[in-house]
């Protein structure tokens, strides 16, 4: 870590995310689940459906159809538990996806036996993150004590009033008590959560730090070494035969795909009334054609659809067929108009 003084590049962070090493603040997900769970339970949970189910059983003197009863129990279960469970699952998934920018950790499923290394395990025990978690646990215990105290001071009258409440009133009282204790805890925890977030982010960025050699290596991988790129351009020219170079020089224009197909168009009304295909090249040769055409001043026009059509329907040194003649002539006329304006 002594030599890792450079901030991580976007590529480094993206590659780390694919390995499951993206920044994820787990406490944020926990807080969202608690809040969503609390308010959905208070909003959707009701004992009235349960009471109606029991009332139906008692009215029928416990002589009911087992299949219908099972179906009714399932419906009541999903009405009471289904909605809170759905929203809790959603609140667990969405914050994680947002934090990871919807990048799936495709490389994280690979087995890594290095995690079984006892030396690494020992280092984790005495790591900064472990110390941070220790102090965080102490703070949360203090917060729990404060929550209990203030909850008791604020809601003790309501707690004792349950003795005089009806069944429906009990549900409302429990809902309020549940909401109050959750909100008290989150209110006292907010500073700890923010501080924990900042420390977690700093530790994550520290783990992602790069040395200058890593940055240089990444740059070469992405951009390619200058000498390598120069040599590659030379090879593109070398793979063209003299005949192909001559065909390029004599062409009116070259229609490009732009990187996989190159179609040369020759047109001279004094020799032939219709344009014909002077060359057809693909892949590396197509790139070489574009490079050489630019060097000798032959226009290259990017038209993906036309290039694909001509490649599929024509051969080298064949006249453009009637079906594609209009498109090719329009392109030639447009090119002449552009040249005349300059």
Curated annotation (Swiss-Prot):
It is a multi-pass membrane protein. One of its GO terms (cellular component) is plasma membrane. InterPro entries: BsaZ-like, T3SS_substrate_exporter, T3SS_substrate_exporter_C. One of its GO terms (biological process) is protein secretion. The chain crosses the membrane at residues 28-48, 70-90, 133-153, 158-178, 181-201, 260-280. Keywords: Cell inner membrane, Cell membrane, Membrane, Plasmid, Transmembrane, Transmembrane helix, Virulence. Disulfide bonds: none annotated. It is found in: Cell inner membrane. Required for surface presentation of invasion plasmid antigens. Could play a role in preserving the translocation competence of the ipa antigens. Required for invasion and for secretion of the three ipa proteins. PANTHER family: FLAGELLAR BIOSYNTHETIC PROTEIN FLHB (PTHR30531), SURFACE PRESENTATION OF ANTIGENS PROTEIN SPAS (PTHR30531:SF14). NCBIfam families: FlhB_rel_III, PRK08156.1. Belongs to the type III secretion exporter family. This is Surface presentation of antigens protein SpaS. The lineage of its organism: Bacteria, Pseudomonadati, Pseudomonadota, Gammaproteobacteria, Enterobacterales. The gene is spaS.
């Amino acid at each position: 870590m002594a030599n890792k003084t450079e901030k991580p590049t976007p590529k480094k962070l993206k590659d780390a995310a694919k390995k499951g090493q993206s920044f994820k603040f787990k406490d944020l997900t926990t807080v969202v689940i608690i809040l969503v769970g609390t308010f959905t339970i208070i909003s959707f949970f009701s004992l009235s459906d349960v009471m109606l189910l029991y009332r139906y059983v008692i009215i029928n003197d416990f002589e009911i159809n087992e299949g219908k009863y099972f179906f009714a129990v399932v419906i009541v279960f999903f009405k009471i538990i289904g909605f809170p469970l759905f929203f809790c699952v959603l609140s667990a998934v969405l914050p994680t996806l947002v934090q990871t920018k919807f990048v799936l950790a495709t490389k994280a499923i690979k087995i890594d036996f290095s995690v079984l290394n006892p030396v690494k395990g020992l280092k984790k025990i005495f790591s900064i993150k472990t110390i941070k978690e220790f102090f965080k646990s102490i703070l949360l215990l203090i917060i729990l004590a404060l929550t209990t105290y203030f909850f008791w001071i604020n809601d003790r009258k309501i707690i004792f009033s349950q003795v005089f409440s009806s069944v429906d009133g009990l549900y409302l009282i429990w809902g309020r008590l549940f909401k109050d204790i959750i909100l008290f805890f989150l209110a006292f925890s907010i500073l700890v959560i923010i501080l924990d977030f900042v420390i977690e982010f700093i530790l994550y960025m520290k783990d992602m730090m790069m040395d200058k050699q890593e940055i240089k290596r990444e740059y070469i991988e992405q951009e390619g070494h200058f000498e390598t790129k120069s040599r590659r351009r030379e090879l593109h020219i070398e793979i063209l035969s003299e005949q192909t170079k001559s065909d390029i020089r004599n062409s009116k224009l070259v229609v490009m795909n732009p990187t996989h197909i190159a179609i040369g168009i020759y047109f001279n009304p004094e020799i032939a009334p219709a344009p014909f295909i002077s060359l057809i090249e693909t892949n590396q040769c197509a790139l070489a054609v574009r490079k050489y055409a630019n060097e000798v001043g032959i226009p290259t026009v990017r038209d993906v659809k036309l290039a694909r059509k001509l490649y599929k329907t024509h051969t080298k040194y064949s006249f453009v067929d009637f079906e594609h003649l209009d498109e090719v002539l329009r392109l030639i006329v447009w090119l002449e108009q552009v040249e005349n304006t300059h």
